[in-house]
Amino acid sequence: MKEAYIVKAYRTAVGKAPKGLFRFKRPDELASETINHMISEVPQLDKTRIDDVIVGNATPEAEQGLNIARVISLMGLKVEDVPGVTVNRYCASGLETIAMASAKIKSGMAECIIAGGVESMSFIPMGGYKTVPDYGIAKQGKEDYYWGMGLTAEQVAEQYKVSREDQDEFALNSHLKAVDAISKGKFKSQIVPITVEETFLNQNGQKETKNYSVDTDQGPRKDTNLKLLNKLRPVFKMNGSVTAGNSSQMSDGAAFVLIMSEKMVKELNIEPIAKLVNYAVAGVPPKIMGIGPIKAIPKVLKQADMKIDDINLIELNEAFSSQSLAVIRELDLNKDIINVNGGAIALGHPLGCSGAKLSVQLFSEMRERKSKYGMVTMCVGAGQGAAGIFEFLK
């Protein structure tokens, strides 16, 4: 089996949706500008040698339709030789693409692939424009297949006995860690600044345009505290415990990695950053989809012949406080190595981008801590879990 090495990894900052900093930036623009920056750092690579662009996206329709991966390839690489394919495993889409690219290179089916994800929840709302559940499935008593994510978070909170107080405290810590990380410049080296052009009518009714650059995650709040979080009302269930404050944010963002074969790495004299050791997905009941990592993490560890104690850092996607705490408690995970710079509750969750975004963040922190093994894991809508183990090489 050949080796597949991650040699570059970048992301955009994450903007709030639907009225945040990227509300005027199309997803294909976000992604193509990120890829363009990443490839510019490897001038010795002939772009026509890239075998594929694999893009994760959770809602591939409208501005994210038309096989957005191919659109991104054309816009970002500015050559017609490189194909593109869009992949949807919902919240795990970005991580799935890294696994697919690594597997193709290891098997000899490719030498160089761009993998990652993009999501604009400003342009495409949660669930898309027209979700039509199968009436026959609902008739069979399986309506939970289509439950909204918030309702599943309530179910997890109830089943795993996660209190409102614990959820709010977890959310607060996510913001505190993220604000601290930003103040220390921890994300600067991984973020590609994106220029946004905003056109509007001024007070005189005249058309004006202004440009601004986005290089900092928009979500983390310095002013949040437990008192404010405790005041928020449940939004998914009467007398529930899941609020806007202890749930992940709707977001816009893009993240990508460049993966090469060992042969190409040597030929181009490039120093690898990391490699994917193993990847696993698992199915769980849709009504408690948030527990997905409880099944996926042991599975990937077994495949890799590793133990949880071998993992030095974990990026656990914080879809909701309730499910994050359920996973941590059920698997008895070490809280000190999880989301050390904050998670999706503070930093945002741009669905199909998140798996790649968390991987980029993981590599950056592994470099700083000189860690050897790291993990990216998340729950996935409709009852799935995903987990990937990375080895840091630099």
Feature locations, PLM:
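Glycine-rich loop/linker segments at domain edges
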Residues: K16-P18, S102-Y160, K222-T224
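Conserved beta-ketoacyl condensing-enzyme motif
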Residues: R23-I113, V118-Y135, I191-V214, K287, ...
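Short, well-ordered amphipathic alpha-helical segments that serve as non-catalytic structural scaffolds
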Residues: P27-P43, I68-I72, T97, M149-V156, ...
